[in-house]
């Protein structure tokens, strides 16, 4: 199945629809203007809709699958995800392994290899999330004694100057 994103006048995705591959193949093929025009004739634009742009469900073109609120960048020919936080800046060379692709935080992600030792002597990774109010990464220590007994969760923050997790 082929997927097409409806874009508004600011290239923001309004919705994504599915079209049979055979219809795309018969009308110019993948990523063609002809296929986009065919979809426009087949499925009328709504509201501020201006154009249809094909998107790839398996990310084989245009960087990533478009979602509602994403932006299409015509000069780079790719879809950009919604900005997650006001302090983050666009970085189209972002790393998916670092947890972000299109947007970069002002403080680098600590990484999955930052670990703590739980009360039973087991090593475990922190679960990091961004705190916009404090401009820092905060992590959880989740202690699990057994499958039925979750222990106390401890909050920490990442201190990039010392490269350590510190208690909140």
Locate the predicted segments by residue.
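Viral virion structural and adsorption modules
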Residues: 1-168
């Amino acid at each position: 199945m082929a997927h097409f994103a409806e874009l508004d006048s600011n290239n923001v995705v309004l919705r994504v629809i599915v079209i049979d591959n055979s219809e795309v193949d018969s009308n110019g093929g993948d990523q063609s203007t002809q296929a986009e025009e065919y979809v426009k004739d087949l499925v009328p634009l709504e509201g501020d809709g201006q154009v249809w742009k094909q998107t790839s469900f398996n990310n084989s073109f245009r960087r990533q699958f478009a979602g509602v609120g994403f932006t299409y960048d015509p000069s780079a020919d790719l879809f950009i995800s919604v900005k997650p936080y006001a302090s983050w800046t666009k970085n189209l060379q972002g790393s998916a392994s670092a947890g972000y692709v299109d947007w970069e935080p002002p403080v680098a992600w600590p990484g999955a290899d930052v670990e703590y030792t739980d009360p039973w002597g087991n090593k475990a990774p922190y679960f990091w999330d961004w705190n916009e109010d404090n401009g820092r990464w905060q992590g959880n220590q989740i202690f699990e004694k057994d499958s039925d007994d979750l222990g106390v969760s401890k909050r920490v923050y990442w201190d990039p100057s010392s490269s350590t997790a510190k208690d909140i």
